[in-house]
Amino acid sequence: LSYTTLFRSGSGTLLDSARLQCHIADCIDVDPKSIHAYVLGEHGDSEMIPWSTVRVGGKDIYQIIKDNPTRMNEGMFESIHEAVKKDGWEIFNRKGNTCYGIAASTTRIVRALMFNESVVLPISTYLDGQYGQDGVFTSVPAILDATGVKEVVEIEMTKEEKEQFDASCSHLQSFYKEV
């Protein structure tokens, strides 16, 4: 790995995405490994969830809700999102740190790099026109292999989701200007 490869990406929302998968899995009583869902944008208050892309065993989340209305409904989206954002703080307040979650995320990234996995992970990387964004490091699905970020995977989002993503990127850009 080159020095520049290591510093053009970060853990981003990988941990938040894992927490999201666990929350959804708890609602519908399936293994989190069966959930395909991402938290994108900033790792923080402006992060967003493109619910239209969430899949459970390949099945659209809205179809899951339709088929299982007693287990999950769209009204739960906001509470799940808030729980994902607050999970880290709850862990920190209880134990004084959150070292295991970020260690697991870092281990996942290192494994992808070391073993040339070409795996799609929601990590922070530099956008150069992807998603209509330029000059911002933010979390998006990216193919990670031994060279680092091989490719940014652009997923389709609804208009509202894209607006949320753009707002998150704008928030990050405004922070860059302050620094």
Where are these regions (language model features)?
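Short, small-residue-biased leader/transition segments that mark boundaries at the very start
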Residues: 2-6
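C-terminal substrate-binding/catalytic lobe of Rossmann-fold NAD(P)-dependent dehydrogenases
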Residues: 7, 14-179
